[in-house]
Amino acid sequence: MKKRYIFFKGLIDTLDLYTDEYVNICSKEGAECLVIDAGIIDRELIRLKAFLIKEVTAVISLNNIGMHLEFEDGLNIWDQYQIPFYNILMDHPFHYKTALDRAPEQMILLCMDRNHVEYVKRFFPNIKRVAFFPHAGIELQKKDAAYAGESCYVPIEERKIDVLYAGGLSRYAAEGLIPDLGSIREFDAFELVKNALEKLINNPELTTEHVIEQCLQEINFKINDKKLGETIAELRFLDALAVSFYREQAVRILAENGVTVTVFGVGWDRCEWESPNVVYAGVTSPAQILELMNQSKIVLNTMTWFKQGAH
């Protein structure tokens, strides 16, 4: 029987790039693929209903997109039609507590870090199927390369960018995640946040959830896993601050030692420091990053606080 898959795109450019790869792979294997534009989901429901007339093999989605769709109030489509929903998380599960608390029974959660799998098993008992799913890569195709040589890859000696870093400074995005710490009455949230951030920066091998739990234990604040999961999700901005600190320091140290670093992404133009060796090139599309990598001698990458996985 011909396999039939449903995909979602139209919300986040980076996820669209990955989704296109999955669609291409499945299509080459002879599968029938329906790609739903999540940006106009109300108009797309007619196409979705028509596709569901025949048996569907699975939904393949990223970061919960399309997971909570309903044709009728209170009836999740994927549970209603008994369709496996493969949900590939690109980020830590604590960023999606509300969505995952309401996950349909048909969801199979795939995490890109082994620690995230254990986190889900502990803090989301409603999720029965979760597995480690290593992050793959996307190969630059000759049709997409600007280089005119026989290979699509530019020889190292001809590459114009010494060091490339493509990624924003998450500390500015983290500002929007900070809750009203003064409203937390059970403990001194300001002091705990200060201690936790210091621990993360001084011990980068530790996970954010481990440090938050450790700080709570140090003040003898005892809570069950349900409340602990809520607290970790509430303080998840610490993760973004720690990531941003090391991301910024990696670029700054290279620049201060005479290395020219070309950076793309939001936030770099807001840094409190400047260096003639940092070239801020603005924001570009995820697809264009592949070609920029092809023009770079070294591509700098910093893990988003993943300890047993890559991103």
Located regions from the model:
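Nucleotide-sugar donor-binding catalytic core of glycosyltransferases
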Residues: 2, 9-18, 126-307
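Extended catalytic core of nucleotide-activated donor transferases of GT-like folds
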Residues: 7-9, 15-122, 139-152, 278-295, ...
